[in-house]
């Protein structure tokens, strides 16, 4: 899914207030030291964004922000993001050139604004991340996009795999076999690239990497850098991850539209730890179909969001996995 998937032209009238945002950040900090991501939509549309970023950083939260490449992403805005103490800024890049990227985003000029944002952040010492959503329309350009990621000096390439929802339809997605081909490309890229590679909604990439490393053995060529993959191990929707919407709804992820509560009435930690939805998502033995029988169910667990989007059952097998346990 990309930012146009459930697009609305104006801000929601019932979105969280600044004070509610502050209270939310305090609840997040009570978890320990999680990574806090401000995303959207476009978080720059909130006049209090910099106030909330500063609050998060002063609370000791590792904080990142994912603005949209719009005219709001000025040099001054990027400098203010840095000055708030933000760890990293992420921007989306879905093609190696303007026709591909702007065609995907549906906004002329988005490609140039994205490159400007990434390059300016690098100039002023703000770490960057590039997010790419893989679809059948840009899969053939992944090597060129990876070259762009290296060119702009990004620290991380976060590759999103499609969850058909909103305007992102199943016809845009890859086949299960194509997923494996992309996994091979990402694995080989991660060996030599000057940046880390991370996947989102492709939990079975962990299974692919585990199988490759097992096949290579200790005497084989150097394995892919373990950093981001090791940090992802076992993380899934509602399992090491929680998403709070602009109106306070508590979801297992931004791609699984099943709410377990609302921070306006429910303590975040209580929902995360006790809500039946979250508890079910953290039980790999409760998964159905081949995911429930899979040797890698604790490492991987499949995309719960994709299972729900394509089958209506968040505990079903991930339809885009070729592995047969």
Regions found by a protein language model. Give the residues of each.
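Cys/His-coordinated zinc-binding microdomains
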Residues: 4, 295, 304, 322-325
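A structural motif corresponding to the C-terminal lobe/cap of the Radical SAM core domain
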Residues: 151, 169-195, 231-232, 313-325
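C-terminal accessory region of radical SAM enzymes
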Residues: 177-224, 249-302, 306
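Radical SAM/AdoMet-radical enzyme domain recognition
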Residues: 15-39, 45-169
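Short microdomains enriched in Cys/His and/or Lys/Arg
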Residues: 18-30, 310-325
């Amino acid at each position: 899914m990309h930012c146009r998937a459930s697009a609305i032209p104006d801000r929601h009238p019932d979105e969280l207030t600044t004070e509610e945002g502050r209270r939310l950040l305090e609840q997040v900090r009570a978890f320990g030291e999680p990574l806090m991501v401000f995303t959207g939509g476009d978080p720059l549309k909130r006049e209090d964004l910099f106030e909330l970023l500063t609050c998060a950083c002063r609370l000791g939260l590792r904080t990142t922000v994912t603005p949209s490449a719009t005219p709001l992403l000025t040099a001054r805005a990027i400098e203010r993001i840095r000055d708030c103490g933000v760890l990293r800024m992420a921007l989306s890049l879905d093609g190696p050139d303007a026709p591909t990227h702007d065609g995907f985003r549906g906004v002329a000029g988005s490609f140039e604004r994205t490159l400007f944002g990434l390059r300016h952040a690098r100039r002023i010492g703000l770490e960057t991340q590039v997010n790419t959503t893989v679809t059948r329309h840009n899969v053939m350009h992944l090597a060129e996009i990876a070259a762009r990621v290296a060119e702009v000096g990004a620290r991380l390439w976060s590759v999103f795999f499609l969850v058909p929802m909103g305007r992102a339809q199943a016809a845009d997605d890859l086949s299960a076999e194509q997923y494996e081909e992309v996994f091979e490309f990402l694995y080989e890229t991660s060996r030599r690239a000057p940046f880390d590679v991370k996947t989102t909604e492709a939990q079975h990439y962990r299974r692919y990497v585990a199988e490759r490393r097992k096949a290579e053995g200790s005497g084989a060529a150097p394995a892919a850098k373990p950093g981001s993959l090791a940090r992802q191990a076992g993380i899934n929707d509602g399992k090491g991850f929680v998403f709070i919407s602009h109106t306070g709804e508590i979801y297992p992820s931004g791609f699984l539209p099943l709410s377990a509560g609302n921070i306006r009435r429910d303590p975040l930690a209580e929902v995360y730890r006790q809500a039946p939805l979250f508890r079910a998502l953290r039980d790999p033995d409760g998964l159905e179909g081949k995911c429930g029988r899979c040797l890698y169910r604790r490492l991987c667990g499949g995309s719960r969001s994709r299972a729900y989007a394509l089958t209506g059952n968040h505990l079903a097998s991930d339809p885009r996995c070729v592995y047969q346990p």
